[in-house]
């Protein structure tokens, strides 16, 4: 089989092509889509590797392998390797070949100041011509060829995600409350400062409690500023989250910060978790809530 997407089969994507044509960008994009990626696997080992993955009991369903000129000594029996894949039951595979014209590849090598692996002491063009000859048979086996000559990395990433991303693939959102006095979280993709909201810390009965307590949450939520802020914030997130999902982002960390991370940020984080939990996989966590007890 040569088409990806059969739920009952292990999906194997083989990525090959010219050095400098974008294989690294492709693999990074596939990793973000949840593919199990293996770089520089000799072609002769592909059937054995596929068999091992099948024996994993379905824990690995989508695999991407990169094969290139680093394994050139194993390219001689490529036809035998492909025939072995064709005869494997429960395997759906697709070969993607990334290419670019000589001028573009030479330009990319000059920009990165890297030497072509087949021309360590000569011009990049000599190595490019040698690589084309080496990969000629592999290109003939490809189910799809993408010419990246006119593509920027972000455009190639978008194409890979659109083609191999699963429709409706889940975006996992971690809403994280924190206190600025303990430092901002370094892994937050989006961060919102709610220190302008009314502070329960100055209400004696509420001070020992947290934003998870109903009376504290009610105190924070009842104010006009909070209601207006949440309306604008939910509108913003409601617009941006689907776009993050379409771009292939699998995880998003939203930081909500107040002074100590005990009252306001906790209440707002809990509210956002409820608001977006119906449409996304949402996890709410409170980094600093217990530090203030």
UniProtKB/Swiss-Prot annotation:
ATP binds at residues 17-24. Gene3D superfamilies: P-loop containing nucleotide triphosphate hydrolases. The keyword Cell membrane does not apply. The keyword ATP-binding applies. Disulfide bonds: none annotated. Keywords: ATP-binding, GTP-binding, Nucleotide-binding. NCBIfam families: PRK05416.1. PANTHER family: RNASE ADAPTER PROTEIN RAPZ. Displays ATPase and GTPase activities. This is Nucleotide-binding protein BBR47_52620. It comes from Brevibacillus brevis (strain 47 / JCM 6285 / NBRC 100599).
